[in-house]
Each structure stands twice: as structure tokens, then as C-alpha cells.
């Protein structure tokens, strides 16, 4: 049974759009995938967040920010609980909504990546792990099949 090559275009286009959409739609912003439960129930693992650049002066209590912890924890998204001056510099005290205590460090302007602009629930699952590999496989299989059909058609025309 020969597959209709037009049917192969549909999953190819969908897979490419799903992989490219976040980067095009939110160009200029930083896209991150939540991997922990520290911000439950607001942010769940596999949620995608869009982070816009911000400075500490723009932050308010209650904002969710992304920052580099410069420790083994890497990039973190937590809620601002206080913005204040310490030793002549503005700093931010943060806490995960699902954590009992505030973070044991202060976020400086150098650490700050930005403020969370939007949350896309569960969408991160298509950009990480097995689903991403499945989408890449769909793209490769569709492309190879379409090239094979194209070559076969061109040979039969000669």
C-alpha cells in the first residue's frame, strides 16, 4: 500500500510548527521549561514560561522572576517576596510558592534574567524528553519519504 505523500506533509508541518512556534512567537524573550515543583500550584513541571527582560527596579512583591542561582540549582523561577537595598545595592528576596522558607540567597541585578510574562501549561513537554525526539523522528521520516517519492516520480518521467 502506497502512502499518499500529501498525508506526510501534515505531520511534518505540525512537527516543525510545534518545535519552532515558541521561538518565533516570543522572539526577544527567554523561553524556559519548569522542571521542579517549587512553584506549585502556579507553575507545574513541563509548563513553559516566557520571561521578559527586567531590572530589579521594575520588580514588585508578588512578581514571578527567573534568575541564575550561581549555585548547583541553576536557573530558578520563584516569586518576589521583597525588594530592598542591601549594602548600597538593590536585591530581591524570593521564595517558591511550594517551599516552606524563603531562598537562602538574595537575587542581584546580575543574577536576574527577567520577569515571567506568560505561562503556557504543559507545552514544555513537546520541547523536552521523548516527545521532542518523537517529533524529530516524524520530521525525518516524513522528509525521507517525500524525497524518496520525489526521486521515484522524476525517474519514472524520464
Which role does the model predict for each range below?
Residues 27-29, 60-62, 75, 87-89, ...:
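Extracytoplasmic
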Residues 35, 78-84:
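Conserved positions in beta-strands of structured domains
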Residues 1-48, 53-54, 119-158:
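Protein maturation boundaries and topogenic segments
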Residues 6, 69-78, 106-108:
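Short coil-to-beta-strand transition motifs
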Residues 81, 87-124:
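Extended, hydrophilic extramembrane loops/domains of integral membrane proteins
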Amino acid at each position: 500500500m502506497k502512502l499518499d505523500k500529501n498525508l506526510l506533509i501534515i505531520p511534518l508541518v505540525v512537527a516543525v510548527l510545534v518545535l519552532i512556534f515558541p521561538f518565533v512567537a516570543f522572539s526577544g524573550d527567554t523561553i524556559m521549561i519548569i522542571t521542579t515543583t517549587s512553584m506549585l500550584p502556579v507553575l507545574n513541571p513541563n509548563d513553559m514560561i516566557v520571561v521578559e527582560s527586567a531590572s530589579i527596579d521594575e520588580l514588585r512583591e508578588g512578581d514571578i522572576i527567573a534568575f541564575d542561582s550561581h549555585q548547583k540549582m541553576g536557573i530558578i523561577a520563584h516569586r518576589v517576596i521583597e525588594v530592598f537595598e542591601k549594602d548600597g545595592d538593590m536585591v530581591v528576596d524570593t521564595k517558591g510558592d511550594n517551599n516552606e522558607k524563603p531562598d537562602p540567597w538574595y537575587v542581584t541585578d546580575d543574577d536576574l534574567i527577567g520577569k515571567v510574562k506568560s505561562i503556557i501549561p504543559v507545552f514544555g513537554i513537546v520541547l523536552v524528553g521523548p516527545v521532542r525526539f518523537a517529533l524529530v523522528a516524524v520530521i525525518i521520516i516524513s522528509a525521507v519519504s517525500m524525497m524518496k517519492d520525489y526521486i521515484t516520480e522524476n525517474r519514472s518521467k524520464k
